[in-house]
Curated annotation (Swiss-Prot):
Binds 1 lipoyl cofactor covalently. The lineage of its organism: Bacteria, Pseudomonadati, Pseudomonadota, Betaproteobacteria, Burkholderiales. This is Glycine cleavage system H protein. GO terms for cellular component: cytosol; glycine cleavage complex. InterPro entries: 2-oxoA_DH_lipoyl-BS (IPR003016), Biotin_lipoyl (IPR000089), GCV_H (IPR002930), GCV_H/Fam206 (IPR033753), GCV_H_sub (IPR017453), Single_hybrid_motif (IPR011053). The glycine cleavage system is composed of four proteins: P, T, L and H. It comes from Burkholderia orbicola (strain MC0-3).
Length: 126
């Protein structure tokens, strides 16, 4: 069974989301996603400053088995990317919840209401 921390929010597309003290959201891929993909060999992340809508494909994660889009969980502006993750994408396999991919600032009027909690995500992947 995959590890699903209770303090995070999730998407149906297997991204995890952590709300930071300053209100920005930190986004990564779940343990289930990295396990399903296998050995991750490449990450393409969005550009800092880019405005995105919820559900937009903003990046790609490639493994030895497949390539999969990374989606924005909310509408907003990309404010940071984890360049260390692009340099060592295999680190996501070892610590999916410790290796974040990008940070996003919510757009005015956007919310996190459509994100799911750990219980709902656990049911989705079981």
């Amino acid at each position: 069974m995959s590890n699903v921390p209770a303090d995070l929010k999730y998407t149906d597309e297997h991204e995890w989301i952590r709300t930071e003290a300053d209100g920005t959201l930190t986004v990564g891929i779940t343990d289930h996603a990295q396990s399903t993909l296998g050995d991750i060999v490449f990450l393409e992340l969005p550009e800092v400053g880019k405005s995105v809508n919820a559900g937009d494909a903003v990046g790609v994660v490639e493994s030895v088995k497949a390539a999969s889009d990374i989606y924005s969980p909310v509408s907003g502006e990309i404010v940071a990317i984890n360049e260390a993750a692009t340099d060592a994408p295999e680190d996501v396999n070892g610590d999916a919840y410790g290796v974040w991919l990008f940070k996003i600032k919510l757009a005015a009027g956007a919310s996190i209401d459509k994100l799911i909690d750990a219980d709902a995500y656990s049911k989705l992947i079981d």
